[in-house]
Amino acid sequence: MFRFRLDGSSGVPPYLQLVHQVRQALLLGYLREGDRLPTVKDVAADLVINPNTVVKAYRQLEHEGIAGGRPGQGTFITATSSPALPEAQQALRASLEEWLRAADEAGLDDEAVTALIAVARQELRQELKKERVQ
């Protein structure tokens, strides 16, 4: 069963962290249409958070068309990711795993890896903007 994790130091509200994790799990194929999400009660107890936080996340997922509640049964994934995405992501994941091994060998911790990716992504976006303008 799918399990959530929270990062208290991320600065991202807990309900958004839950929403982002479901989106990512769906894109990566860890969750599929019809899969049941953990109950509000279970998530709240597991993460030691207010159940209303979980309800807010699940409502956001419902609003986005990603999940839907079934009375008396729970909340289920209702959306599917693009069929081509998992295949495309397999190649990207293989490249990423190779890169992460190199980062690990270089002694980078999770925070340094995240920062490096964020900076590289930002620089690439700026570069792409410049190319579009020219």
Short names for language-model regions:
Residues 104-134:
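C-terminal regulatory/oligomerization modules of transcriptional regulators
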Residues 81-106:
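Conserved segment of winged-helix/HTH DNA-binding domains
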Residues 15, 39, 73-90:
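Short, cationic-aromatic polyanion-contact patches
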Residues 30-35, 62-72, 76-79:
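Beta-hairpin "wing" of winged helix-turn-helix
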Residues 52:
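Key DNA-contact positions within bacterial/archaeal DNA-binding proteins
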Residues 1-10, 126-134:
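N-terminal intrinsically disordered/low-complexity leader segments
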Residues 36-47:
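A short alpha-helical element within helix-turn-helix/winged-helix DNA-binding domains
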Residues 24, 60, 119:
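Alpha-helical DNA-recognition elements
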